[in-house]
Amino acid sequence: NMITGAAQMXGAILVAYDSIXAA
């Protein structure tokens, strides 16, 4: 998704946020 795409650009915090959102 958009969050994952941003995370790939170096957003470690967004990775955690995306994981929480998915949970």
UniProtKB/Swiss-Prot annotation:
Supply the alphabetized keyword list: Cytoplasm, Elongation factor, GTP-binding, Nucleotide-binding, Protein biosynthesis
Cite a single GO MF annotation: translation elongation factor activity
SUBUNIT field: Monomer.
Q: What else is known?
A: Different sizes are detectable in 2D-gels depending on concentration of the herbicide dichlorprop [(R)-2-(2,4-dichlorophenoxy)propionate].
Organism lineage? Bacteria, Pseudomonadati, Pseudomonadota, Betaproteobacteria, Burkholderiales
Question: Main role?
Answer: This protein promotes the GTP-dependent binding of aminoacyl-tRNA to the A-site of ribosomes during protein biosynthesis.
- Can you summarize the PTM annotation of this record? The N-terminus is blocked. The C-terminus may be subjected to proteolysis.
The record's subcellular location field reads: Cytoplasm
Note the superkingdom of the native organism.
Bacteria
Whose protein is this, by species? Answer: Delftia acidovorans (Pseudomonas acidovorans)
Q: Which family does it belong to?
A: Belongs to the GTP-binding elongation factor family. EF-Tu/EF-1A subfamily.
A single GO cellular-component term on record: cytoplasm
Provide the protein name: Elongation factor Tu
